[in-house]
Amino acid sequence: MNYKVKFEHVTKKYKLYNKPFDKLKDLFFRSKDGEYHYALNNISFEVPEGEIVGIVGLNGSGKSTLSNLIAGVTMPNKGTVDIKGSAALIAISSGLNGQLTGIENIELKGLMMGITKEKIKEIIPEIIDFADIGKFMYQPVKTYSSGMKSRLGFAISVHINPDILVIDEALSVGDQTFTKKCLDKMNEFKEQGKTIFFISHSLSQVKSFCTKALWLHYGQVKEYGDIKEIVDHYDEFLKKYNQMSVEERKDLRKEQISQFQHGLLQEDQTGRERKRKKGKKTSRKFKKKRVLITGVCIALLTGIISTGYYYKNLLPFNSENKYAEKVASKENVTESKQMVKKEKGAAKYIVNSNGISIREEADASSKRLAIANFGDIFTISDSNKNEKKDVEWIQITLSNGEIGWISTKFIEPFKSNNNIIEDAKLADVTALLKRVYGGNMVSAPTYFGKTLNELETTYPQPLNPLPSMTGKTIVKDGNIQFGISQDKVVEVVFQDISMSIAKLHELLGKESLSNDAEKNYFYETKSYYIAARSDQTHKEIQSISIVKK
């Protein structure tokens, strides 16, 4: 077969570190021991020239890693990747320098792809026309929205005329007009016989455009071949997956990881086996290092003690200092006891992840009452804790007074800290959203405290009722959602906003609490609690929840 792309037993893994120091230490003392995440594990496939392959799979299955391997952004740990021709990767802001303008990025990317300056000057007008972002082409890319970055990245990549085009979710943030323009361009490439890899969560786009499908499932190729057959199989799987609770999804992931030997492998056990195989030679090597380090430490300690012996007055060991030390110690104990009392009296807990089930009983199999998300705050009863099936549960009170149970893995004590930002910071956020989504974004927080009837009467647009959440009545208008509890507006949520994480931090500064794995951030102002939650790709902020204190 005359293939264009060929993967043979390819494995890509990443070492996990508990803290930055471990990573630094690994630079000097290379060690294969530790935990690894296997993004791709022993995958093989061939793609003939002219095929358009749709790559589907759940988040974390290795789709973006696969696209990076095809584009040459990263190299495999094992196996071979054979690419015939040049490949261009199109992802949101991929390869774009935020400090440079759009024009400067075109020149930079063209030069990196080996295009002459004369040729770059020829294609710049075509790229400007295709991207259609107006005067922003002459502004730094860091000021762009996700959609504008996607437009520029796509325009550059298709006009440098690559042999292989890799599109990683780049069409997910554009409007329908631009998406159609992109699909038309991709069809041109298809007619020219170019090979295209199309990564998307939109099964309709994959089915209508692609000629083959590759289903990645937790680092393995589950199916590869006929587009209709594989998309139908994946769609059936998604329907079942979407009906699962968060706990059931995590159980499925653990089961698949165990089956495919993928993800967080049990490196402790393999590490011990590896150490035994190294034998006495390695043991002697490390023993010499330990002896050397111990000797240096003893020498330093001896020098410090000798200095202290001859210069006693430099050391604060007189009786007065001892007395002061005792007084300070008593004060610290008293203060510590007071802090413990305060903590015991605390009645607020905060959810630290998204999509967490609140159960009727302290059991994962009991009826689900509601779904809680990162930043939701609940009151609890001190004594109402229960341990069942090795999982500790805590009883919480919903907004409507209903009692429910939530696993303590997903909730933690909420404490206000000194990192409280000004209310004006929220105004900066709504002012930015106003420019994109309209004036209602700015006025939305003014409806706090209004009854449902007052809200429906004074709000300029019709409000659509939605199913209740965590004990709140929900009504919505476009990107704005209101939460009503005890007939008062208590929450405003801006949805589908596609804000970059860098822009969020630029507007609000340092967060009070974060979930770095899911890219969720919690802020506290003098009057509000603000929870910024990322989308499923964890690449940008999808919603911002505002709750009045």
Swiss-Prot record:
Domain SH3b as annotated: residue spans: 346-415
InterPro entries (UniProt xref): AAA+_ATPase, ABC_transporter-like_ATP-bd, ABC_transporter-like_CS, ABC_transpr_TagH-like, Bact_Polysacc_Export_ATP-bd, P-loop_NTPase, SH3-like_bac-type
Main localization of the protein described in the UniProt heading: membrane
The enzyme's E.C. designation: 7.5.2.4
Residues the record lists as binding ATP: G57, L58, N59, G60, S61, G62, K63, S64
Family label: Belongs to the ABC transporter superfamily. Teichoic acids exporter (TC 3.A.1.104.1) family.
Protein name stated in the entry: Teichoic acids export ATP-binding protein TagH
Domain ABC transporter: 22-243
Keywords, sorted A to Z: ATP-binding, Cell membrane, Membrane, Nucleotide-binding, Translocase, Transport
Gene expressing this chain: tagH
Pfam family, one: SH3_3
GO MF terms, alphabetically ordered: ABC-type teichoic acid transporter activity; ATP binding; ATP hydrolysis activity
Bilayer topology: Peripheral membrane protein
Catalysed reactions, semicolon-separated: ATP + H2O + teichoic acidSide 1 = ADP + phosphate + teichoic acidSide 2
Localization: Cell membrane
Region ranges (Unknown): 244-549
Any single GO CC term annotated in Swiss-Prot or TrEMBL for this entry: plasma membrane
Root EC class: translocase
Subunit relationships: The complex is composed of two ATP-binding proteins (TagH) and two transmembrane proteins (TagG).
Function: Part of the ABC transporter complex TagGH involved in teichoic acids export. Responsible for energy coupling to the transport system.
